[in-house]
Amino acid sequence: TIGATTAFSSLWLTPKISAFWKIHPSITVSQVVSDVPGMTGRCDLTIHYGNPQENGVEYRKLFQDHIIALGTTRFAAEYRISRLEALLKAPLIHSSSKETGWTSWHDWFAALGFPAPKGRSFYVNNYMIALQAAQDDVGAVLGWDGLVGSLVNEGRLVKLVQESIPSPVGFHLRIHRRATAKARLFADWLATSP
């Protein structure tokens, strides 16, 4: 059993499980999907965003992303976004869930040496809803390129500007003590799969 947030499960983990089953069809993988901290406590494996700080706990780094500004081509055309200065004035979608510790627009612009954005704001506490809102032209959204790659590849969202920042932390897989040999095999595969 593996626990992850809705966004991580939908955008990254579920496609990986499909690939894993092609190699290991006899191993059952169950997901516990929750955006509430602590709801994945009975899992063999859990995925976390941040730097692990617990001593004696086994973790594997999955990846560390770059954070990019995303929107639709219609949104980019309507707000004439080709440079950061235009993005500062455009409507922005903010992920307001404190549990994630994700980078905010204010953090993103500051890391690039720009002031806080001045455009209209839309706040949401679920990253999947934030991504859907961006696809519906509500505003621009920050994207972790390892998570949102499929949305960009399918043309549902595009990079609005060339600038990006490295994510301050990565995504890690926690291997709980109760993890079975099959769960560990899955963990090893996840940590090394492309």
Language-model-derived ranges and their functions:
Residues 12, 54, 102-108, 124, ...:
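Tryptophan-centric aromatic hotspots in well-structured domains and transmembrane helices
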Residues 163-194:
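A late-sequence structural motif
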Residues 115-160, 164-166:
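Hydrophobic hinge/microswitch elements
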Residues 6-7, 73-74, 128, 146-147:
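Alpha-helix/helix-capping structural signal
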Residues 32-101, 106-117, 121:
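Acidic, Gly/Pro-rich loop/turn segments at junctions of secondary structure
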Residues 1-55:
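Central regulatory/effector-binding core of bacterial HTH transcription factors
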Residues 1-3, 46, 70, 93, ...:
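Short, well-ordered beta-strand segments
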